[in-house]
C-alpha cells in the first residue's frame, strides 16, 4: 500500500503560505497511515507569521477631496483593514489591521494593530498684500487684498478703520494649510 504525494499548503494561491509534500511508502518500517495523519493534523494547526505591520507608503497632501493612503505591506489575503481608512482634512488618522485565518503577528497574536497615517497641509505660497489705496471718507473702510482666500487664511489684526493712518492686518493659515516655509503662525 503506497500513497502518492499529498500537498498540504499553498494550493496555488497567493497567500504567502508554503506547500509541504507528504508521501507514504509502506516499504519503510515504523511509518503507518496513523503517522501520516498525525503529520497532516500537525500541519493543519500551523500558523503563518506576518513579519511587519503595514505602514503608510508615500505622503498625502490636503486637496479638499477624500483620500486614502497606499499601504506598504498590506495583503488582504492575510489581514483585514479597519478603523479610519480615508479622510478629507489635514491631520492624523488611525487605521487598524487584523490577521485572518492562520496568520498571526510576530508576537503570536491576532490582535488588531493600530497604525497612524496622515494627510499633510497644503501650501499657501504668498502672504496677502493690500491692493489699491483707501482714502479717508469718514466711514469705516477695509482694503482689498491680493492672494487672500478665506478658505485658506483667517484675517486678524486691524481689518477696517475710519481714520487716516497705517494699520496692520495679520493672516493665519486655516487647519488645512501652512505657509511655504512650513509654519502655521500669523504673518
Language-model regions, residue ranges each:
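Solvent-exposed beta-strand/loop surfaces, strongest in extracytoplasmic domains of secreted
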Residues: 46-187
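Short, low-complexity N-terminal tether/leader segments at secretion or assembly junctions of large
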Residues: 1-45
Amino acid at each position: 500500500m503506497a500513497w502518492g504525494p499529498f500537498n498540504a499548503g499553498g494550493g496555488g494561491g497567493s497567500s504567502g503560505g508554503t506547500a509541504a509534500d507528504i508521501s507514504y511508502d509502506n516499504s519503510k518500517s515504523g511509518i503507518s497511515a496513523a503517522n501520516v495523519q498525525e503529520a497532516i493534523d500537525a500541519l493543519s494547526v500551523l500558523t503563518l507569521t506576518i513579519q511587519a505591520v503595514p505602514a503608510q507608503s508615500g505622503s498625502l497632501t490636503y486637496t479638499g477631496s477624500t483620500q486614502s493612503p497606499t499601504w506598504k505591506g498590506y495583503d488582504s489575503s492575510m489581514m483585514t483593514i479597519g478603523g479610519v481608512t480615508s479622510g478629507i482634512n489635514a491631520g492624523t488618522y488611525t487605521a487598524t489591521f487584523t490577521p485572518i485565518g492562520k496568520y498571526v503577528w510576530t508576537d503570536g497574536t491576532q490582535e488588531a494593530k493600530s497604525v497612524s497615517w496622515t494627510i499633510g497641509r497644503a501650501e499657501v505660497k504668498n502672504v496677502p498684500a493690500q491692493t489699491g489705496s483707501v482714502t479717508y471718507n469718514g466711514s469705516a473702510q477695509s482694503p482689498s487684498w491680493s492672494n487672500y482666500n478665506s478658505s485658506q487664511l483667517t484675517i486678524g489684526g486691524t481689518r477696517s478703520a475710519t481714520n487716516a493712518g497705517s494699520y496692520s492686518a495679520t493672516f493665519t493659515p486655516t487647519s488645512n494649510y501652512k505657509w511655504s516655509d512650513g509654519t502655521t503662525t500669523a504673518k
